[in-house]
A protein has these predicted regions:
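Active-site beta->alpha loop and helix N-cap motifs at the rims of alpha/beta catalytic domains
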Residues: 5-125, 146
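Rossmann-like adenosine-cofactor binding region
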Residues: 390-461
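NAD(P)-binding Rossmann-fold cofactor-contacting core
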Residues: 35, 371-392
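Rossmann-fold NAD(P)-binding glycine/threonine-rich loop
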Residues: 436-486, 490-492
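Phosphate/diphosphate ligand-binding glycine-rich loop within oxidoreductases
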Residues: 225-339
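Glycine-rich adenosine-cofactor-binding loop
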Residues: 172, 227-235, 321-326, 333, ...
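Catalytic alpha/beta core domains of metabolic enzymes, predominantly
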Residues: 94, 100-226
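Glycine/small-residue-rich loop that forms an oxyanion/phosphate-binding "nest" at active or ligand-binding sites
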Residues: 59-104, 291-341, 345-347
Length: 506
């Protein structure tokens, strides 16, 4: 791993000495510059000499109590005695001391002190007062971690970071709080935390070392970094942060892109509150596309037609909304069905079957109707199919009737075939034929069952990766005004969704 990891503290928490030592060594090989050793995870009395024998970088000694999110099971006196042993052992450069005990343990030689406060059950109303008191303690770094109850709680942590009077690391736990784990670096945090092994469940919402390093490039984040993100619910599965951050790095744009989980019905409040950061632009996914169109102050023709937006860009007087799925669908079809220098895409007299009636289906239906195609919509809920078909002068089909008529182009806008249900297809193989164009918007995996069967039957195929990269590229251009690095964006996405995922990003 060649990326700069100096702004990541790698957290290691294992029960067995052997595994602790092994993970410390491996973290060093992967480039870790600072490791927090969660001694409260060690099942037996820790043998510090054994654990520290091959340490590759500075270490933080942490022994967390259950009320602070830890696993320490013995007495408090024993915990404080062990902390003192760590401090005088010569093996730790840092020690983490909770605010209520920091004044009881004196500074020793050059060992630096993190004075910390954790509340993983709630967001304290007096957090600012707690922070002010902590700043009066003998701390080299003040650390605040509290449970986010809403996306707006990230902003309170950011405000604390903005007003910090000494080095501070303040972020929220849980998936609602993930943005602050990354954005604290913009506001002066000396480092953020990441798990060596995410599956170990060291702390709620704690990302992995590889994830932070590969996706967010923390070494590039500074006070001038612009902020973008994707908003949706759920959002943890999104590959948009990987793709957009890779594009920013490729084009040397000083920006970072983070995921925001926002529940249905709360987008307007979220957009208003995050004006304080500010977030310069958003990708918008389920369930907020219609709400995004309504929240925008200005919009382009694609949003007017589809009444849905997948992109919001901050302007001086509010948000501008666009639907980049619309041009991306046409661009993917044009690349597949036309030749360079030849006539433009002509869909007149073409019969198109669209499977689904959600956001992407709406963009496809309106784009192809305007391009001259005859559009049929098949959906499990016939009422939704009828509503969309009426908008594009098309025909609605019950899901069971989707094989009724032959077509020139079929676009799957349903999740059928998406991981983990990779052995499913929305169409019978017998429906597919040579000369047909089969466009599957599912991109995990890229080669879905539908795509495989279409190739076998001699049909022309367009994959969901093509669509994803084109719509993300159009968003990148709206965000930055620059031409998107589509090749690089496609490369990192395909690597991420491949059966064997590599972690050696260059």
């Amino acid at each position: 791993m060649t990326a700069d990891a100096t702004r990541i503290c790698v957290v290691i928490g294992r029960t067995r000495h052997k595994m602790v030592a092994a993970e410390i060594r491996e973290a060093g090989k992967r480039g870790a510059a600072l490791i927090e050793l969660r001694i409260d995870f060690v099942a037996r009395a820790p043998d510090l000499k054994r654990i520290l024998a091959e340490k590759p970088c500075p270490l933080i000694a942490t022994i967390r109590r259950p009320q602070d999110g830890g696993r320490w099971g013995a007495s408090e006196d024993a915990r404080q005695m062990l902390l003192k042993q760590c401090i005088v052992s010569g093996g730790f450069e840092w020690v983490d001391l909770e605010t209520d005990i920091a004044d009881k343990i004196r500074r020793f030689k050059s060992v630096k002190r993190i004075v910390s406060y954790h509340d993983l059950a709630a967001f304290p109303p007096d957090l600012e007062d707690i922070y002010a008191r902590m700043c009066q303690q003998d701390a080299d770094v003040v650390k605040l971690v509290v449970a986010a109850q809403s996306p707006a709680d990230n902003l309170r942590m950011i405000e604390i970071m903005k007003k910090a009077t000494k080095p501070t690391i303040a972020f929220c736990s849980g998936d609602l709080g993930f943005p602050s784990r990354i954005l604290c670096l913009k506001y002066g945090a000396p480092f953020t935390y990441a798990a060596f092994n995410k599956e170990r469940g060291v702390a709620p919402g704690l990302p992995s070392f590889d994830e932070v390093l590969r996706i967010y490039h923390p070494e590039r984040i500074n006070a001038e970094t612009r902020v973008y993100g994707v908003v949706g619910d759920p959002i943890g599965h999104s590959h948009s942060p990987l793709v957009h951050n890779a594009a920013f790095k490729e084009c040397d744009v000083n920006a970072v892109y983070v995921p925001f989980r926002v529940t249905r019905g709360h987008l307007p409040q979220f957009l208003d509150s995050f004006a304080a950061v500010p977030v310069e632009g958003f990708s918008v996914t389920i369930p907020h596309k219609e709400a995004a169109a309504q929240a925008a102050h200005t919009k382009d023709e694609t949003v007017t037609l589809t009444r849905a937006a997948n992109t919001l860009v901050r302007k001086p007087h509010g948000f501008f909304a666009a639907n980049t799925d619309y041009p991306a669908i046409l661009a993917a079809l044009s690349a597949s069905l036309t030749r360079p220098g030849g006539p433009p895409l002509d869909m007149h007299k073409r019969m198109v079957l669209i499977l689904g009636a959600g956001g992407v289906a709406r963009a496809a239906a309106h784009a192809l109707h305007k391009a001259g195609a005859t559009v049929h919509i098949a959906n499990r809920t016939i009422e939704r199919a009828k509503k969309l078909a009426d908008e594009v002068s098309g025909e609605a089909l019950d899901w069971t009737a989707r094989h009724k008529d032959s077509c020139d182009l079929v676009i799957n806008c349903t999740p059928v075939g998406m991981h983990p249900n990779i052995d499913e297809s929305p169409l019978h193989a017998s429906f597919l034929r040579p000369g047909m164009v089969v466009f599957d918007t599912v991109y995990t995996p890229e080669t879905t069952m539908l795509i495989r069967e279409a190739k076998t039957r001699g049909a022309q195929v367009i994959t969901g990766v093509d669509l994803f990269i084109r719509q993300a590229g159009a968003q990148f251009e709206l965000f930055t005004g620059r031409e998107p690095p589509l090749d690089r964006m496609g490369q990192v996405l395909r690597r991420a969704i491949s059966p064997v995922t590599l972690h050696d990003e260059d």
